[in-house]
Amino acid sequence: LSTRRQRQMCIRDSYNTMVKEKQVFLPIQRDHVRLYACGPTVYDRIHVGNARPLVVFDVLVRLLRAAFPKVTYVRNITDVDDKINSRAAERGISISELCEQTIFSFHKDCKALNVLSPDIEPRATEHIAQMIAMITGLIEKGFAYEAEGHVLFSIEKMPDYGQLSGRSLDEMVAGARVEIAPYKAHPADFVLWKPSKAEIPGWDSPWGRGRPGWHIECSAMSAGYLGEEFDIHAGGLDLVFPHHENEIAQSRCAHGTAQMAAFWVHNGYVTVEGEKMSKSLGNFTTVEDALQRHRGEVIRFSLLSAHYRAPFDFSDAALQQARTVLDKFYRAVSVADRADIITDLTLLDTEFITALADDMNTPLAISCLHRLAVEANKGQLASARQLLSCASMLGLLTDENLSLIHI
């Protein structure tokens, strides 16, 4: 069966935030998919809301790798940020010590959730030279300007600014995380470089000792590893504006390209009783704490039980339900041989793959797993094999010890 057929089955319709509708996914390079996802700012342990994009885009990468000869997955580490500086000072430890501790914990949480490592995991602090070069180019081309030790991007020089978020300039100024400052030519102009005081991290630059703005970090790293234009940029819904909007502006203007990424994919929020889970509201559960009560696979399954673009309401009841279903699935696959897992998409259950191909509809895909489990419990070995293979595509039912318990 042809590789072309596998690709057609992989992502038939994927929602693209840029155009606000589903589109057929075709990579820029026929045999190579390039994907960038925004990673953590390493000042604290991740909570379940932070874990959702990790799990969702892990499934996306697994699906892409099953369909295409080469996938390059880049997920960055933001290790220069004012939150990091403040947290290190609060704890009385060095910034480097805080970052290393947090990165170690992050990787530990990813492993517990069965989130595969990206092909490349660049750290912002290791790419300052590339950021300075990109900012210099933006100034030379007239898209950025220096003011009081800061370098700012002039959003009025970018006619398409606001296309991703669909916001007008007035809405942007009124929106969250737009800092009004007297040195800005326009209130919505955003920082590319800012000065650093002696006690916080800084690097020498043409504009004095300072540090990069948040947005330039991802633009420089994605271009360095994936090129000036690449296939998919992924992240949480809260990153659409200002982060991704600003990435697009500075990247397109720096490189003179029509786009930064062809597809923009964003996951919905994790909520608690209908309210967004966030550290600022204090209604969060860290992955570390959740793992004290449930194994990582249960958390992963619960996050996949809702469509990735819809809100997911996190609760103990949701986790208990996930555990019950997983136990049922493990009983059903106990007769299957793990050596016979199917990896060819064209041989997997058609309804399951069709569900994933339609904008990664994991709830519908999971309903297919329920059907296969019912058939497997009736003694249909082929269905048990399909259940194990399809679940593997979601990063589930991978614990051989749990399968053995149910034999």
Descriptions of predicted regions:
Residues 19-22, 28-114:
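N-terminal, positively charged nucleic-acid-binding surface of large information/translation enzymes
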Residues 118-122, 233-235, 377:
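Short catalytic-loop micro-motif centered on adjacent basic/acidic residues
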Residues 5-8, 12-43, 58, 107-108, ...:
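Alpha-helical recognition segments enriched in aromatics with Gly/Pro capping
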Residues 91-97, 118, 309-313:
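Short, polar/flexible loop-turn hinges at active-site or ligand-entry regions and domain interfaces
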Residues 47, 215, 406-407:
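Conserved adenylation A10 loop of the ANL superfamily
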Residues 276-278, 282-405:
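Structural preference for alpha-helix termini/caps and helix-kink/transition segments
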Residues 77-82, 103-106, 116-131, 149-158:
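Short, glycine/charge-rich beta-strand/loop segments that flank catalytic centers
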